[in-house]
Amino acid sequence: MPGYTVKDVNQQEFVKALAAFFKKSGKLKKPDWVDTVKLGKHKELAPFDIDWYYIRTASVARHLYMRGGVGVGAMTKIYGGRQRNGTRPSHYSRGSRNVARKVLQSLEMLKMVEKDPNGGRRLTSIGQRDMDRIAGQVVVLSKKH
């Protein structure tokens, strides 16, 4: 297990494993509005997956691991998409700012993320340690299959 980082594992498997860790640990509380919210104005429906909040939190944590100093505005760009306008041309639309802000705040409550003095948020040493440990577990599980 030692010596493996988040960069060494498949990103989809890692995000699923980290989301399962968040859900199983019980420290990450899912807000009440999670089942009724859309993830951006370009979306027509709310997400179908009931655990989407854990998956989004894991995805944001992985993104902060890869490049720190990312704030709410950058997260809305990352999770944006194509807005369909009927017969008119489609355009890019940003993701929900509220969802991005609440995800970052919940990661701060877990002490995995802290505010960067240069702007945005960055991963703490505790967060990096936990994510590297989970990456090592993902490597062990992927070698068994």
Curated annotation (Swiss-Prot):
Gene Ontology BP terms: ribosomal small subunit assembly; translation
Location (main, coarse): cytoplasm
Location(s) in or outside the cell: Cytoplasm; Nucleus
Gene Ontology terms, MF aspect: RNA binding; structural constituent of ribosome
SMART domains: Ribosomal_S19e
Top-level taxon: Eukaryota
Positions of disulphide bridges: none
Pfam families linked: Ribosomal_S19e
InterPro entries: Ribosomal_eS19, Ribosomal_eS19_CS, WH-like_DNA-bd_sf, WH_DNA-bd_sf
Alphabetic keyword roster: Cytoplasm, Nucleus, Ribonucleoprotein, Ribosomal protein
Entry keyword Cytoplasm: yes
Any GO CC annotation of this UniProt entry: nucleus
General function of this protein: Component of the small ribosomal subunit. The ribosome is a large ribonucleoprotein complex responsible for the synthesis of proteins in the cell. Required for pre-rRNA processing and maturation of 40S ribosomal subunits.
Protein family according to the UniProt entry: Belongs to the eukaryotic ribosomal protein eS19 family.
PANTHER family linked: 40S RIBOSOMAL PROTEIN S19
The protein's assembly and partners: Component of the small ribosomal subunit.
Protein name: Small ribosomal subunit protein eS19
Gene name per UniProt: rps19
